[in-house]
Amino acid sequence: MKTKEQKAVLKKCRHRAEIPMTVAAIVLTVITVLLVILLVSSVGKDQKAAEILTEQLEYEQADIDFAVKCGKYLLIAIVIALFLKLVWELFKNAGIAMVNDVPFEEKYDPKLYKEYRKYCEKFGIQEPPKLLLATDKENLESTGITIKSERYLRMDLSSLDVASATEDDDVIRFEVLHDLAHIAYHHYHYALLIATVVARWIPVVKSIYNRIMCYSADRLAAELIGREECVTIFLRSYMQSAYESERREEYIKRLKDQKLTFAERISATLYNLTQDTPSYPDRIRALIKL
């Protein structure tokens, strides 16, 4: 159970577009389910409609029966497809994790694991998820997964490589905080809802929602370790050339002062609609504006 203080922090850091999109997704999902139920329930009444249609248009009864059966089978196929899509989304990430990930236990790094438990307490997560190191970075789509009621947290293995190269654990600290933020916000469940139903109607919705979730998680991580520290971690870990002391301030200043023309803004928007995560410059720019 989260305390009032924890709930206040979660509310403060959540992206303003996240709740409206989640509500819209739930409403659209409910409407979709109701429409399917109404269509399926109306199949039994099609026989009477078929008789009226036969009298008015003088169609062959066999043709009408065939059309009714086709409609019935089509509705059943739609229901089965939605169900299979839900099952696929539920088990896809779990399958990827079981095939590509390796467990990370307390004995490997007691200090990091102790901090991990401390962060879980700060987020109001009573039972810390088991840590997995994701070796397949391209499929690191969902950081929080559930397998047989066990919760897991997937961490990017390359983050350990960066931490080892820079001799600094800050990047791991941020990675853990960012991923725990996704769990604290229940992002996996909402993303599953959108991927199963809403994204079938509006394909770009999934990528937009994933980007919003990423911004929310960044904000929550920044709330705990500091905005400037997060910017530094981004620059040091993912944009090493921009992190060099003589370039850092210049780079941040360019991000703040960058002005896009109308055509450039349209091009950037269209590109972002196809991306599931924001670019690192976009994430840094969002943190700077906090």
Model-identified regions with their sequence ranges:
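Catalytic Zn2+-binding segment of zinc metalloproteases
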Residues: D179-A195, G226-E229
